[in-house]
C-alpha cells in the first residue's frame, strides 16, 4: 500500500462513515464460514479487490457467495474521482509481474465460474494497462478454461489500439462505466469525459458486434430523471446491452456528498425505461457494476429480462 503524501490520497479506511440512511438502505450483513474462507483466500494471495479498496457495501454479501472483484494493475489510481475511495497517486509503481498468477490462484481456490476484473486507471502507461490486463486474462483462461471473464476497464484515454488489444483477449463482457449523467461528469469524474466513454463503448460494439457490452451509472448525485432517461438512451444508441444503476453512497466526508436517496420504486421505473430501449437493466439501491455479475450474465444468456427478483 502506498504511503499517503502530497501526491497520494486515501480517505479513512474501515467502515463507511455514518450517515442517516433511509430504511431501504439498511442491511443485515451476512457472515459465516464462506465469508471467512473468501476473506482468507484474498488475504493469502495478497490481491487487492475493489470490494475492500472502494468500501463496497456489498462486500459481505458477495464474499458469502464466494465472489469477489479483483483490482488489477495495483491499488493506486492516476485519477482522483470525487466518488471513489481508491488511492490516488501521480507516480504509481510498476505492475506486479506476479499479479496474473495471484489472481488466477485466488479464483481457482474460490472455484469462480465468472471472474470479474476491474482496474485502476493507469494513465502513466502507454497503453493504459491494456496489455497487462490481457496477461491476466490469458492466465485465467489457462488456469480456469471453463470460466468466463468480465472486465471493467478505464477509458484508456481514448486509445483505440489499447481497446482493441483488450477486446482481442477473449473476454466475455466488456464493461466501461459512464458513472453519471453528462452534466455531472466534470464534477464526478477526474480526467474523463462522458462523450469519450460513449465513444469507447461504441467502438467496442463496432469491433466485436457479438460481444456483451456493459455500462453503469450511480444515482443520487443531483441528476434529474430526464437526464437518467437520456443517459439510458445514449447507452443504447452506442451499442451497450447491459446497464447497472445503483445508489451513490459517499465513502467519507471528503467525497462528493449524496444529494438524494433514490427510492426502490424509482429504480424500478428506470429499469422499465431501459428495458423499453432494448437494454438489460439491473437496478436497485445496492447495485454496483460487478454485484451479482454472474447472475446477470446467466439471466442475459437465458433471455430472462425480469431481474426484479435478483438480490439488490
Curated annotation (Swiss-Prot):
Keywords: 4Fe-4S, Cytoplasm, Iron, Iron-sulfur, Metal-binding, S-adenosyl-L-methionine, Transferase
UniProt domain Radical SAM core: residue ranges: 63-280
Disulphide-bridged cysteine pairs: none
Cofactor note (record): Binds 2 [4Fe-4S] clusters per subunit. One cluster is coordinated with 3 cysteines and an exchangeable S-adenosyl-L-methionine.
EC number: 2.8.1.8
UniProt cross-references to SMART domains, sorted A to Z: Elp3
Keyword Transport among record annotations: no
Cofactor dependency: [4Fe-4S] cluster
A Pfam family of this chain: Radical_SAM
PROSITE patterns: RADICAL_SAM (PS51918)
Top EC class for this record: transferase
Binding-site positions, [4Fe-4S] cluster 2: 77, 81, 84
Binding site for [4Fe-4S] cluster 1: 51, 56, 62, 290
SUPFAM superfamilies per record: Radical SAM enzymes (SSF102114)
Pathway: Protein modification; protein lipoylation via endogenous pathway; protein N(6)-(lipoyl)lysine from octanoyl-[acyl-carrier-protein]: step 2/2
Highest taxon above the source species: Bacteria
Record GO cellular component, one term: cytoplasm
Gene Ontology MF terms: 4 iron, 4 sulfur cluster binding; lipoate synthase activity; metal ion binding
Subcellular location: Cytoplasm
Family the UniProt entry places it in: Belongs to the radical SAM superfamily. Lipoyl synthase family.
PANTHER family noted in UniProt: LIPOYL SYNTHASE (PTHR10949), LIPOYL SYNTHASE, MITOCHONDRIAL (PTHR10949:SF0)
The protein, known as: Lipoyl synthase
